[in-house]
């Protein structure tokens, strides 16, 4: 399995200048290849990445004097990215990809962030004095390394965040880590309308802290100040504007780190308790373009799904009629609309909480695909309409509820 390790690094001013030069040349490589492709398409000529590379190699010494100072491994990785971008675009046009991929675009010098990848030709290692050695031209880089990446090295990426911090991501190929094998499975229903973030088939409801909403007033205040300091028509803004822009970026970074930390803890606790986690196969990209776009981004359900996928066993099922179907008898009630949170089955008179019922149906769909067929009527229901047999009062559940109250 491929695993990435991220470390904070502290390059010197000379090393920062080298990284910016490398990023600039990689951007020129990308834009040159894209320009050659567009010219070939207009003239009905055959074109490939190798042809554009040869054309650029001929004019490279005349275009940039310091091009020979750049590491060739970073340029090789850039060509791999160009090839992948065009291949993904062509596959998307032919319908060979699930998600739509747009055509590659030119990279702007003004708005592009520093992100440089080195291929397997580089051999990163940690020196005894706590420095990272990636390439000879870059030299040893000071960093914070709590642990090192174990496995076969694939590639490394150095990037600079909008706040000016530098990080290195080392991707390695290692043996899969042992996962939970206790045989337990749980269904999870995602809720973007109410306070409950996810509802589990065992009756657990997890509230989302909504970190972006908590910081919205402070963020709005800082963004207004930044907007007032922006002068339209100026190519280079004032120092006060860039300082204020840094403050806004720091706030966004804090919110993102809070959300990521909370989701890591939540996903780890779910995977420790259950071997299989079943969720609905929802297109979050479409959901984000609707009325709940800001909530979808603030909750981070897509990030939670990805975390569960590599920490445990994630299964996606068809979300059709999960809220309208009675988990006791299987009757589909067409009267259950979006705003109905509690309803009674007209067929078996069972009372349901909309989200818990949906989570149970999600789990039933997975069980049916595994050959476990049949629905059992619960002996009794609780105040919310959830089957008493499905609500487990464990220490594990109370710790979940504590996530939303922090």
Regions found by a protein language model. Give the residues of each.
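Gly/serine-rich nucleotide phosphate-binding loop at the start of the catalytic core
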Residues: 1-77
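Generic detection of short hydrophobic beta-strand segments and adjacent strand-loop junctions
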Residues: 7-9, 139-147, 206-208
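Short, surface-exposed charged micro-motifs
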Residues: 8, 115, 123, 155-157, ...
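Hydrophobic (often cysteine-bearing) scaffold residues that line and stabilize catalytic clefts
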Residues: 15, 22, 26, 71, ...
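Stable alpha-helical structural segments in soluble proteins, enriched in small hydrophobic residues
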Residues: 33, 77-89, 356-366
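Long, hydrophobic, amphipathic alpha-helical segments used as structural scaffolds
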Residues: 34-37, 41, 86, 90-97, ...
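Acidic carboxylate diad motif detector
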Residues: 51-161, 253
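Positively charged, helix-rich recognition surfaces that bind polyanionic ligands
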Residues: 150, 162-406
